[in-house]
Structures are given as structure tokens and as C-alpha cells.
């Protein structure tokens, strides 16, 4: 009995450790993307072509649902339109909304197809299809895209008010500098909320 509890505890600790490592890796990757946006944009474009080629080859050589493959291909066409403004994105823009809708539709389509008992596939093949045809590009965009600071939990009303009073080239530069990656904003927001709950604030003294 006691050994069974230790096994469950070890699984829980292993899961937490993996989640923390994954979060740290994603945060580091978002830092790299922010510093090298042009290179990141080029690699995302090549990765998108690679995934679209995989979808095309799956439609030729594998007996998969044509509708699900078509939804995945259309979804990646929608993702491709986001590259025109990379690494910035407007969360209320039609490009972003269409991309989110296409991701949801593609995910549901594949889920319904694999849920059908007549379409039995090994678990590894299902994960491979979801990884490349559904999850890969949206995950890359999630950790690399930047959003307007007004649409994130860490929004600063003062900075946005100050930016609105500046015109010309400096205004555009200030707007871009005030945008931070979505993932970094989420980490900062989570850190602030954790500090509020625990009552622990970082105290820095300058002499």
C-alpha cells in the first residue's frame, strides 16, 4: 500500500518536472524568436511548406479522410497569412480569427475520424498525424507571435496612453517596442498573480 503511494507520488513529481522543463524551454525559445524575428519567420515559412507537403503526400499514399486532410491544408493556408505581420498579430483581426477557427475545425474533424471504430489506427500514427497536421504550426506561432499589450493581462494603460500622443516614425517604433510575446506575457502575468496570492514581492534596495 505504502509503495503504491510512493509510485503515484513519483509519477506526479515526474509530471510536474516535465511541465516545468517544457515551460522553461518554451520561454527560452520565445526569447530567441524575439531577438531573431527575421530568421524565425523564415524557418516558420519553411516548416509550413514542409507540413503542407506532408499533408499532400498523406493524401496520395495513405488511406486517410480527404475532408480532414483538406481542413488541415486550408488551416495552414490561413496560418500562412499571419506571416505578413510576423512577429506581430492583431487578436481581433480576421486573419487571426480565421486561423483559430480553422485550427478548431481541423482538430474536431480528425478527432471524429479517429473516434470512428471503423477507422482504427495505432496510437503512434494518430499522434504523428495530430503533431504534424494539426498542432505543430499553431504551437510555433503561439510561442513566437507578439500581441498588442492592450489585449494581454499585463496591459499597462499608462504606456498605451503615452504612445497615443506620439506621432510620426517614433510612434510606430514605440508601438512595436511596447509589444511583447504572448508566452512571456503569460509567464509574467502568472508570476504576478502568484506573488499576489502568496504575498511575496521581490524587494530590491538601491543604495
Swiss-Prot record:
One of its GO terms (biological process) is endoplasmic reticulum to Golgi vesicle-mediated transport. Belongs to the SVP26 family. It comes from Dictyostelium discoideum (Social amoeba). Keywords: Membrane, Transmembrane, Transmembrane helix. One of its GO terms (molecular function) is COPII receptor activity. Coiled coil: none annotated. It holds the Pfam family Erv26. This is Protein TEX261 homolog. It is found in: Membrane. The keyword Signal does not apply. GO terms for cellular component: COPII-coated ER to Golgi transport vesicle; endoplasmic reticulum membrane; Golgi membrane.
Amino acid at each position: 500500500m505504502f509503495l503504491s503511494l510512493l509510485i503515484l507520488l513519483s509519477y506526479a513529481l515526474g509530471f510536474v518536472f516535465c511541465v516545468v522543463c517544457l515551460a522553461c524551454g518554451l520561454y527560452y525559445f520565445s526569447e530567441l524568436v524575439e531577438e531573431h524575428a527575421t530568421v524565425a519567420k523564415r524557418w516558420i515559412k519553411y516548416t509550413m511548406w514542409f507540413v503542407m507537403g506532408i499533408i499532400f503526400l498523406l493524401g496520395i499514399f495513405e488511406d486517410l479522410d480527404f475532408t480532414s486532410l483538406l481542413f488541415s491544408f486550408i488551416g495552414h493556408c490561413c496560418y500562412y497569412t499571419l506571416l505578413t505581420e510576423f512577429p506581430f498579430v492583431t487578436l481581433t483581426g480576421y486573419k487571426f480569427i480565421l486561423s483559430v477557427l480553422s485550427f478548431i475545425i481541423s482538430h474536431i474533424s480528425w478527432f471524429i475520424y479517429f473516434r470512428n471504430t471503423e477507422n482504427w489506427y495505432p496510437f503512434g500514427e494518430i499522434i504523428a498525424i495530430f503533431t504534424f497536421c494539426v498542432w505543430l504550426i499553431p504551437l510555433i506561432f503561439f510561442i513566437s507571435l507578439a500581441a498588442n499589450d492592450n489585449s494581454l493581462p499585463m496591459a499597462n494603460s499608462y504606456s498605451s496612453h503615452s504612445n497615443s500622443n506620439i506621432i510620426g516614425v517614433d510612434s510606430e517604433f514605440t508601438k512595436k517596442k511596447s509589444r511583447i510575446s504572448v508566452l512571456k506575457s503569460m509567464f509574467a502575468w502568472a508570476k504576478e498573480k502568484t506573488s499576489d496570492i502568496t504575498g511575496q514581492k521581490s524587494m530590491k534596495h538601491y543604495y
